[in-house]
Amino acid sequence: MSKVCQVTGKRPASGNNVSHAHNKTRRRFLPNLHTHRFWVEGENRWVKLKVSGKGLRMIDKLGIDQVLADMRTRGEKI
């Protein structure tokens, strides 16, 4: 299962765990993803998206219709 936000495109980032003794081991920083259903009034249906916390705030600010229109212009299938 892909760990990518469908709205913002956020992906896992890589970095280091750093111990108290400054020993470094590689790790992944995963995005804060949640599967969420949104009701789209214009299409009269539910849309299920995998979104990050920032993606949820964008949907709150812009509205689900605007976000879906932007996703469709990028060529993403919804």
From Swiss-Prot:
The segment annotated Disordered runs over 1-24
Q: What would be an example GO MF term here?
A: structural constituent of ribosome
GO BP terms in the entry: translation
Q: Which UniProt keywords apply?
A: Ribonucleoprotein, Ribosomal protein
Read off the InterPro entries from this record.
Answer: Ribosomal_bL28 (IPR026569), Ribosomal_bL28/bL31-like_sf (IPR034704), Ribosomal_bL28_bact-type (IPR001383), Ribosomal_bL28_sf (IPR037147)
Which cellular component terms (GO) are annotated to the entry?
A: cytosolic large ribosomal subunit
- What's this protein's family per the entry? Belongs to the bacterial ribosomal protein bL28 family.
Q: Which HAMAP family match?
A: Ribosomal_bL28 (MF_00373)
NCBIfam families (UniProt xref):
L28 (TIGR00009)
Put simply, this protein is called: Large ribosomal subunit protein bL28
Organism equals Nitrosococcus oceani (strain ATCC 19707 / BCRC 17464 / JCM 30415 / NCIMB 11848 / C-107)
Tell me the gene name.
rpmB
